[in-house]
Amino acid sequence: MGFGDLKSPAGLQVLNDYLADKSYIEGYVPSQADVAVFEAVSGPPPADLCHALRWYNHIKSYEKEKASLPGVKKALGKYGPANVEDTTESGATDSKDDDDIDLFGSDDEEESEEAKRLREERLAQYESKKAKKPALVAKSSILLDVKPWDDETDMAKLEECVRSIQADGLVWGSSKLVPVGYGIKKLQIQCVVEDDKVGTDMLEEQITAFDEYVQSMDVAAFNKI
């Protein structure tokens, strides 16, 4: 298992393909699996790898919560597609002599046990929620205006990046390009969200992270279902 060399374009492409239908490296919540892979990536993936970039920006936002993310961090080769071998160069040996602080926490045995317990609790809660299937789920229909930088922005790529955002309780709908003047068109895209899982702040944060294509995002219409 692995992603190849995550410091190379080829390795980042493998990561991007792997995340095309996943929000996280493992499971349904950010975990130490995401931390391990995040640490191996030397920086933000390029904008054309929109799945990898969306994941990178999302995991980066958990920097303050890194110690409490569930799971036990394993070797990088334990994650990713089964048919790819990990060849990412590790800086673990060299970094022992440095004064740099590890971006994502320690391998403390006690902390790992606590993290494992926390992960099992969260998974149990998730399975419990799934099994209960509440009779009424509050949902909203949202129409978003996503504006590009100029008339040279690749709108097909912009829409691909937007639709790459996946979350439990989020379903993308129809879209169209609407002229705004000077040859510029904005993307108008519909989505349905479960109110207790997905909010407009989260959507705005993840959409505007694709800043090579996206200038801004506005909520054009918001209706309870």
Swiss-Prot record:
The modification N6-acetyllysine is found at residue 7. The keyword Nucleotide-binding does not apply. Residues 2-90 form the GST C-terminal domain. Keywords: Acetylation, Elongation factor, Isopeptide bond, Phosphoprotein, Protein biosynthesis, Ubl conjugation. GO terms for cellular component: cytosol; eukaryotic translation elongation factor 1 complex. SUPFAM superfamilies: eEF-1beta-like, GST C-terminal domain-like. InterPro entries: eEF-1beta-like_sf (IPR036219), EF-1_beta_acid_region_euk (IPR018940), EF1B_bsu/dsu (IPR049720), EF1B_bsu/dsu_GNE (IPR014038), Glutathione-S-Trfase_C_sf (IPR036282), Transl_elong_EF1B/ribsomal_bS6 (IPR014717), Transl_elong_EF1B_B/D_CS (IPR001326). The modification Phosphothreonine is found at residues 88, 93. One of its GO terms (molecular function) is translation elongation factor activity. It holds the Pfam family EF1_GNE. The modification Phosphoserine is found at residues 8, 42, 95, 106, 174. GO terms for biological process: translational elongation. Residues 96-113 have a biased composition (Acidic residues). Residues 78-115 are annotated as: Disordered. EF-1 is composed of 4 subunits: alpha, beta (alpha subunit of the eEF1B subcomplex), delta (beta subunit of the eEF1B subcomplex), and gamma (gamma subunit of the eEF1B subcomplex). Interacts with elongation factor EEF1A1. Catalytic subunit of the guanine nucleotide exchange factor (GEF) (eEF1B subcomplex) of the eukaryotic elongation factor 1 complex (eEF1). Stimulates the exchange of GDP for GTP on elongation factor 1A (eEF1A), probably by displacing GDP from the nucleotide binding pocket in eEF1A. Belongs to the EF-1-beta/EF-1-delta family. This is Elongation factor 1-beta. It comes from Bos taurus (Bovine). The lineage of its organism: Eukaryota, Metazoa, Chordata, Craniata, Vertebrata.
